[in-house]
């Protein structure tokens, strides 16, 4: 009756609706899910909910899932393998219909390989095998950023990253190395700084560059969040960007165009990432018999602004 059964008369329907109003009745989603064997819920595990990049992607995911009658169950792994695996397990216990995971760990560390045959899974920015996946052209994006710095005369370029393994860190690292190689510049590995994920890691890594590596003229950061921290560390010392040191970020979060100077960065297509992941998981939920797995590869775009100085 509640689903619009045509065999129920209008008179009976009105009586039931009146009784529901008097009792302040709300249809029980759990009861319906037990009958239909579905919760109409998709679990989403992101790496850092404070990062505007993830916020924008989640908005896109939620928009599409809501249009298909699904809700989002969100968890924040904080770039830790333990929390990622913990939240995946908890979501399965809560009977979500599928999972979208922004993967932060390797094949050996992740439990996705163990559960992908019992629940639909889509990974984002991941190299895990045999799952539907949404990736961006991270190697190309990083290559363009570092190549641009080199073309502006910078040869000593620091790279700030988080201290964990996943495909987008690996691919951005490949782009960093390839740009140096193609321009005939030998890489000094001390310029690659990594840190555990903390609110101040970018600030501390930038101070290490400024204290220990005075020859560095540019910093490339794994994401714009780290670039924001680098700005703060540099400006707290009374130094100027880009006159004293240049910065290039990654993601093109909304804040990037509001920073002073505006941040040169690599843009990721946040809306398309979220929409693609949501479409893949709904397709997989509705037809779990599919044997082939799909990888969506989306392009990045290099955005030139005011944070890089030509020092040739």
What are these regions (language model features)?
Residues 1-39, 312:
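N-terminal helix-turn-helix DNA-binding module of bacterial transcription factors
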Residues 20, 65, 179-180, 210, ...:
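Conserved hydrophobic residues forming the short capping helix/wall of the S-adenosyl-L-methionine
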Residues 33-147, 151, 211:
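Alpha-helical recognition/docking segments in bacterial nutrient-uptake
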Residues 46-56, 74-83, 109, 134-144, ...:
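Hinge/beta->alpha junction and helix N-cap segments in small-molecule ligand-binding domains
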Residues 88, 96-103, 158-160, 213-223, ...:
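Periplasmic-binding protein-like
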Residues 155-156, 187-191, 241-246:
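Short acidic capping loops at alpha-helix termini that bridge into adjacent secondary structure
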Residues 207-208, 212-312:
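Flexible loop/turn connectors
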